[in-house]
């Protein structure tokens, strides 16, 4: 019999909602009540419904324009505002170039052309996990993958227990579709896991096969790889490119898919040590537990989250002049560096994926500014951050000195 006097049509509709949830990874809400019968809970379901899509920003078009107008009046860019230590970075010290990389990563990719992956390889104890915990997770949704054998292909992608579509258990990647994934201690992963990531990182989707089933699932996620150099690495006999051996058998394929790669033993530099120690002691003293401090930090995080969701939907347009400037800066300045040749052209004389990533980087900076068009300032920022990223592949300089123009 149909519970609660529901018709067969309403029951069928509820079952369809549950089936679509299993297929697409959407969240469902269930309303009803339960009674205790013989020490067991018996649930009586009233309604089954698809929950609201939380990827949609609550910021309206007029609110966005008012905010951008205020920034223009005060002669401050939105990106500069979100990089202030008093806003989103109260609990973590980082040089500006790393802050920019994190803000780019926090955009929500809408399709494979928006994907922006970052690699950060540094020495132990540099606070990479703290970066995710104190900056990224409070700001935007991010899935954190396990390290070593705790991270499995089934856990990342999903698994099928039979030949029926309803038996699919979705993994972390499809659950975080249009969001982000952080990989902590990636150097402990089995190389086979990296191999399975190739299609996801490039195309934002993956295929699963079992029995007679061959299905495709979305996995449009920005990825950040945080890890340490391989055991064999040392300052005396290796250069920074050797750090990338942490990616194992698929090093060159992963490199081709990473928009930005930072490889250095220090992400901050010696002058920052005192500031980092100050942050540690402030946290231990409970500074960030103060109600007023927490209220202000939460305000910035909520506003930043809605702003990032809103601007992620912008499709910045490129004029003919801008297209020419992107081409010239890429071919004349980015591609002609020694680091680019060593990292990306060892296996092939062409890597069109890097050109696509550079163009996407220009568009991403436009989004962070809330701009409907790509301007020369966005190209300049994209060029600078990519040059700094590649410079760390060849030279062991701290990021704050690199960002200041050290050559």
Language model regions located:
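Basic, amphipathic alpha-helical bundle interface domains used for macromolecular binding and assembly
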Residues: 234-236, 244, 253-255, 261, ...
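Structured beta-strand/turn binding interfaces of compact recognition modules in eukaryotic regulators
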Residues: 31-33, 184, 226, 377
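OB-fold and OB-like single-stranded nucleic-acid-recognition modules
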Residues: 1-79, 191-192
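Conserved ASCE/P-loop NTPase catalytic core
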Residues: 1, 78-309
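N-terminal secretory signal sequences
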Residues: 1-16, 27-29, 328, 332, ...
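A cross-taxa feature marking solvent-exposed loop/turn segments within ectodomains of secreted
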Residues: 37-39, 113, 372
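Active-site-adjacent bridging/hinge elements
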Residues: 3-7, 72-81, 197, 322-338
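Charged/polar, low-hydrophobicity segments characteristic of intrinsically disordered regions
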Residues: 126-140, 387-407
